[in-house]
């Protein structure tokens, strides 16, 4: 194990308040412990994501459709990868927020790249890729 290094994190005050409540619910002694676990979870997911070949899955995005240009940018990214997107469901969660769920099928690496591009688009509040098998290799 390497040496401990301190670094700063800037967060919206509302997000920090929710994070602190979550830390209390999960019995974390410090924010640092919770952040370490979050980082570890992301690293484990990265290991899982390195599998290649044909995959299927879902990608869920939550975003504020009022944010300037965001809906158009997300649509452009989806059209650029139309061959991977089998279906899209768009739900109005409330006056401001939308949930978009995409069913994906194709090369695992391409699916992951698309998901990363969409999730990292400025203005996306939350995104989650769930991968599964196409079933072709299952008996």
UniProtKB/Swiss-Prot annotation:
Record-linked InterPro entries: Acetolactate_synth/TF_NikR_C (IPR027271), ACT-like_dom_sf (IPR045865), Arc_rbn_hlx_hlx (IPR013321), CopG (IPR002145), CopG/NikR_regulator (IPR050192), Ni_resp_reg_NikR (IPR022988), Ribbon_hlx_hlx (IPR010985), TF_NikR_Ni-bd_C (IPR014864)
Source taxon at top rank: Bacteria
Metal-binding among keywords: yes
Residue runs in coiled coils: none
Alphabetic keyword roster: DNA-binding, Metal-binding, Nickel, Transcription, Transcription regulation
Binding positions (Ni(2+)): 79, 90, 92, 98
Keyword Cell membrane among record annotations: no
HAMAP family according to UniProt: NikR
Name of protein: Putative nickel-responsive regulator
Source organism: Maridesulfovibrio salexigens (strain ATCC 14822 / DSM 2638 / NCIMB 8403 / VKM B-1763)
